């Protein structure tokens, strides 16, 4: 399905990201993963095993460093012949306080890891997709982007901005054979989330692998007519 395609998956060593990496590799893509902890990438490679890991590549990269991201993605395109797919999974949650008690430092941190990383990755990848004559972008937003709650303003604002980014990309690239879509998960069924909320009904949570299959559809040939969409992937959560 994705043979000959080159994909970048940010946040690819995390629970959702690694499921996306596995799914894209299984579909035949070559996958490149930026990481901040080499041991996490080594663990990912070991868990994937051969032969899938033979099509896995990556490098240490600060996704908030514009110059470094531009250089790294240019190197990916040079080494692998281009960039066809970008999946922006990198991000993180912080909350717990109402707006009037939330420091600007926390706002900045949430904007940096959830929005800036995606903006810089899109800006660096799109020129290489244009050179290839097409591509697909999937940005991970959140249910919180459209259904806010108490004490999550900074995170929700950053994820809401991801939707605007996605819509802008779709409008700008619609005549260039490049699609841009967003997915909106809620609580994902991961060991860390189970440990953090042991009394929750975990059967209502969505497995990372299920979300990864939606990503696979969005970057595949059957989704070429879909762009600018924000797709809920939170099931009963």
Regions found by a protein language model. Give the residues of each.
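Conserved glycine-rich Rossmann-like NAD(P)H-binding loop of the short-chain dehydrogenase/reductase
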Residues: 27-44
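Active-site helix of classical SDR
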Residues: 122, 158
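Alpha-helical segment proximal to the catalytic Tyr-Lys
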Residues: 127, 170-175
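Conserved glycine-rich cofactor-binding loop
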Residues: 13-14
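Residue(s) in the substrate-gating loop at a strand-loop-helix junction
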Residues: 142
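C-terminal helical subdomain
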Residues: 175, 182-183, 190, 200-237
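Substrate-binding pocket helix/loop in short-chain dehydrogenase/reductase
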Residues: 97-99, 106-111
